Design a protein with these regions (language model features):
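A conserved short coil-to-beta-strand element within the FAD-binding core of flavoproteins
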Residues: 138-152
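Glycine-rich FAD pyrophosphate-binding loop
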Residues: 20-45
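Short hydrophobic core segments
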Residues: 5-6, 29, 162-176
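Beta1/beta-strand and adjacent pyrophosphate-binding region of the FAD-binding site
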Residues: 1-11
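Flavin (primarily FAD) binding-site architecture
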Residues: 169-187, 204-207
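Short beta-strand to alpha-helix junction loop
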Residues: 56-66, 107-128, 265-266
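N-terminal FAD cofactor-binding segment of flavoenzymes
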Residues: 46, 56-87
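Conserved flavin/dinucleotide-binding core of flavoenzymes
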Residues: 11-14, 21-22, 43-45, 90-106, ...
């Protein structure tokens, strides 16, 4: 059996790892020049590595991928996780800063963690063995998948063709909604309906270094009472729990509230907007103490186009395989409903691989 994996994000890399363990032939076709997808890091901005993409370890999402079990249970010798417990949480609304003590209780209940001295990218990257890396074709965006015969043919933007018995699609759902990949024959109506019903929000992260710390551990702009899966914009001290001597404030925005940031035309316009917003909250101190910044605008990232899914569609239909030939995995495609989290994406890859090898069609 020969398998093609489209996408080298968390799900694609995990699927490759699972197939390697079973000694099954596969290739990974990755559109960008690097693997990781929405799992990305920068090591040179601060005195600790920074997650430019997925950052939190959402323990409340009980996805059980074999690769993440030791990590989630705190038994991984290579990757230390600490409990994320910010001490000062404020909300800025109608020109006033207010303490939000109840949010501390909520965060304790959610029990999120963060990497102490590494990142989600480091965790995914350690699965990419030298043998696997030889199987990854970088800068190879797939634009067409033909599946009318027993053999599947995937065609890249450059015209190169790859052949296999089965294909696993792990691209962000935004790419399927935009029909970046042509399927021949076309996807059935029920699959297209499920894909288009899902929402994929805008999203970005910005990290700013200041010469002085003038901000709390977390500050929410506007209403703090909303579904964080659907919309959020929060500034947070990125050094909480880290061994750092720097003053790094981060902005994470996703969903409808992120559009005011992601829609700005230039990075300068975005920085000016953020500093003005912070100056209003903190009496001009953001501009006064600004040193440098780094921006990761996921809405403008090629082959991604946003943050993550909003759980609006039918996950079971989204992830259901087609004719025992085309399979789906990723953070939006976990049939058990454990979506969004990186370990949810990893679990979806194991479930898809299992279905491939057993020819099980859930629909």
């Amino acid at each position: 059996m020969r398998i093609l994996i489209v996408g080298a994000g968390a799900a694609g890399i995990t699927a490759g790892h699972a197939l390697s363990e079973k000694r099954i032939d596969f290739e990974i076709l990755e559109a960008s020049s690097v693997h990781g997808g929405r799992v990305k890091k920068t090591a040179g901005f601060a005195d600790f590595p920074i997650d430019l993409g997925a950052e939190w370890v959402h323990r409340a999402i009980k996805a059980k991928a074999p690769t993440t079990q030791a990590l989630l249970s705190g038994q991984s010798p290579e990757f230390r996780i600490f409990n994320y417990r910010p001490k000062t949480i404020l909300q800025y609304k109608n020109g006033k800063l207010r303490s939000k003590r109840w949010m501390k209780l909520l965060l304790a209940l959610v029990n999120d963690g963060k990497f102490a001295d590494s990142t989600w990218f480091d965790f995914i990257d350690q699965l990419v063995t030298p043998e696997m890396k030889k199987k990854i074709h970088y800068s190879t965006p797939v634009i067409k998948i033909e599946h009318s015969s027993n053999e599947i043919v995937a065609t890249s933007a450059s015209g190169e063709q790859f052949r296999a018995d089965k294909v696993l699609i792990t691209v962000p759902i935004k790419m399927l909604q935009d029909e970046y990949i042509e399927f021949a024959p076309a996807l059935p109506d029920w699959k297209k309906k499920a894909i288009n019903k899902e929402q994929f929000g805008d999203g970005l992260k910005v990290f700013i270094e200041f010469s002085e710390k003038f901000y709390p551990d977390v500050v929410e702009i506007g209403s703090a009472i909303r579904n964080p899966l659907e919309s959020d914009d929060s500034y947070y001290d990125a050094t909480v729990g880290k061994n750092s001597s720097k003053n790094i404030l981060a902005l994470f925005a996703h969903g409808p509230t992120a559009t005011k940031y992601t829609s700005l035309k230039t990075d300068k316009a975005l920085l000016d907007f953020i500093l003005k917003e912070l100056d209003e909250v903190f009496d001009g101190q953001a501009t006064r103490y600004y040193k440098k910044h780094i921006i990761q605008n996921w809405s403008k990232e090629p082959f991604i186009g946003g943050s993550y899914s909003m759980r609006k569609g039918s996950v079971k239909e989204l992830s259901a395989p087609l004719n025992n030939k085309i399979y789906f995995a990723g953070e939006a495609m976990n049939p058990s409903g454990k979506t969004i989290a990186v370990h949810g994406a990893c679990e979806s890859a194991y479930l898809a691989v299992s279905e491939m090898l057993t020819n099980k069609d859930r629909r």
